[in-house]
Amino acid sequence: MVKQAVKVFVRTRPTATSGSGLKLGPDGQSVSVNVPKDLSAGPVNNQQEQFSFKFDGVLENVSQEAAYTTLAHEVVDSLMAGYHGTIFAYGQTGAGKTFTMSGGGTAYAHRGLIPRAIHHVFREVDMRADKMYRVHVSYLEIYNEQLYDLLGDTPGTSDALAVLEDSNSNTYVRGLTLVPVRSEEEALAQFFLGEQGRTTAGHVLNAESSRSHTVFTIHVEMRTSDAASERAVLSKLNLVDLAGSERTKKTGVTGQTLKEAQFINRSLSFLEQTVNALSRKDTYVPFRQTKLTAVLRDALGGNCKTVMVANIWAEPSHNEETLSTLRFASRVRTLTTDLALNESNDPALLLRRYERQIKELKAELAMRDTLSGKGRVSYDDLTDDELRELHATCRRFLHGEAEPEDLPADSMKRVRETFKALRAVHVAIKADMATQMATLRRATEEGSGAAARGGDSAGPSGVGDVDLRATGGFTVGHAPLDARPPVRSELGSPGAGASGAEALGEPRSPGGGLHAQASSHTDAGSNWGDAGPLSSPGGTRLAGIFGVSGDRNAVFRRYKVDVGEGRELAASLKAASIALADTKASIRSLGASVNDAKQRIDELSSALALRRGATPAGGDGEVLDSEAYALMQELKSAKSRYRTDFDSLKSAREELEPQIQAVAVARAGLLEAFDRWAAAQSDTTLKRMATAGRAMSGIAPGEEDEMDAGEQFERMQIARISERDPDSLAFHTALKRTGAAVSRPATVATGGNAKAAAMATRKMEHTQAVNRGLAR
């Protein structure tokens, strides 16, 4: 890890007042604030008037582009190199924090750090063609000490969100939506969509004051390539827009806005306490006091490259707020973070890395053996046949039938296996000796007992007695002619060779391919442009006006073009039909591929069987020539291809039925909407649309939707923007896409949560103020 100091920059809001008391040093890094003495304190007044601060830079009357170059360019470059980064704006309300981070509305030249950082990231992605990148974005809001997901499907809920730590002590928000984006336009569209869900309110100092803290995060995953995907570098950039601190006696807020100001000031106060504890190097740092400090834990003292923007409003009436902001910024500048490269700890990636390293080490061993004049040495694990042969060699060695040179010693693996085999054979021999000794003792005891009883009859085993006095020893008896010692099995019997081919999934259906099932489905989307039978009230009315079905279909065609509801439903039906057709085509293609792979497997299996039958086997087992080996490799590849195509075919079949149902539902919905519309129209309107619809009969399918005047204007506007500034095309396109979308606050207001209640309370307070004549 590398110690990295937190950089702090000051950005001033332009002001028309000349005698503001704020002076900038000639070095561009120092700031002096002159606070006049309070004359009401009396003649003895030791109040300090001059305050000086030094930072990493001061931005006064600079453009948004210059601000981005100074504040964020280096951080984004570090992000692309695999390091975490955070940029947060701090200051009083109305000082320009949101303008610095997000920008000035729809003006492209006034876009803030977030849109410019998105453009920078995707420009670097396009330039680095030798690497593979995946980019995700998330947008978090902290409102009244509650977390909200501004990009989630249900942004009104916050119960599932929680700030946690991973195994590397990095903070993350559980349950926060990560949206994958593939282009600058998609990322900007998500940002603009999240902006619509932010909570704002107006007061005397700011007409659109942010009532919450927001964190827009860009997550970047970098790999060297798809083939060599064993190393992944993960990094993220947090772009934080803090709500402004307020003096309620100046803003004059009441009711719900006052409550929000209290939460904002409380969270910023705890943030200041956390910074003070870090600057003093206390053993305990209160990161968990608020959601804001928990989210900013890495930015203040963890693995992150952090930049702070202190926004100040250099007006004489705001000297106290300016001085407070500069003091906080000077304390933040004393902090340091531990910067380290962030590599993924995914077990799958580690497995790929270890496999590659093992392969490289084996190649190096083979090269060393070749250079040292050794023969081909195998460093792989021993097979079952090799283990059985090794045990037999060790047994012969212990019985004195083999020499030490017969034991393998060409690699450490074989030496270890030899010692294991020697131990196993020794244990087995020892067990045999123990069994034989037990048998001898039992026979001796039985013989001694029979001699003591003086019996002269043969025992159950047919072994006679011998006079101990005549032999001078112990009796062992006479073994019968059919007696033999038990045969002890070897450590393992040679197994039978592999027989039969592998099971290759389901066989082909006779008379048809694997795609026969797909082709048997009814093409529910092939005739999606026909009005169908009109037996409902609207259809009955159309049948009464028009005698032939062609006129009814003509009205139906115009309904899909001229009526907004019909145009949307027809587009949905067309999209569902196209998706269904693509799935069917994919099933047919995959079915043919599976059948071809199965046929190729059968051919290769037969050829390999013939080759094995024609090649005599050696004494130690089968010896494969180059042609048989090539057939085996090709057979293995064919089986792998068969399994891949078969799994894809199975997945496509599972998607087919839901898509057929989707086409049927879309078609039924279109016909039902057309029926309702036709029942409510006049005869003149229907006849006019029938005439226009008959004129469309010569138009080819897919060419019915001609551009209207508005669409032509948009096309011309996009072309003009592309000619003037190609880099701004993504910004304007994303802004247009999200501008036509449904506003997020309306969705949030129905969520039944704290934000919805706050919006309802603020609306009620505004209504009461209007009734009392205090507002408009």
UniProtKB/Swiss-Prot annotation:
Annotated Low complexity bias: 447-460
Keywords linked to the UniProt accession: ATP-binding, Cell projection, Cilium, Cilium biogenesis/degradation, Coiled coil, Cytoplasm, Cytoskeleton, Flagellum, Microtubule, Motor protein, Nucleotide-binding
PANTHER family assigned: CENTROMERE PROTEIN E (PTHR47968), KINESIN HEAVY CHAIN ISOFORM X1 (PTHR47968:SF36)
GO cellular component annotations of the record: cytoplasm; microtubule; motile cilium
Role summary: May play a role in rotation or twisting of the central pair microtubules of the flagella axoneme.
Gene3D superfamilies per the UniProt record, alphabetical: Kinesin motor domain
Domain Kinesin motor residues, every copy: 5-335
Chain spans, region Disordered: 441-535
Residues given in the record as ATP binding sites: G91, Q92, T93, G94, A95, G96, K97, T98
GO annotation terms (biological process): cell projection organization; microtubule-based movement
Protein name: Kinesin-like protein KLP1
The organism's taxonomic lineage, starting at the top: Eukaryota, Viridiplantae, Chlorophyta, core chlorophytes, Chlorophyceae
Coiled coil: 348-371, 579-657
Domain of life: Eukaryota
Family, per entry: Belongs to the TRAFAC class myosin-kinesin ATPase superfamily. Kinesin family.
Positions of region (Globular): 658-776
Species whose genome carries this gene: Chlamydomonas reinhardtii
The UniProt record lists the keyword Cytoplasm: yes
Subcellular location: Cytoplasm, Cytoskeleton, Flagellum axoneme
GO terms, molecular function: ATP binding; microtubule binding; microtubule motor activity
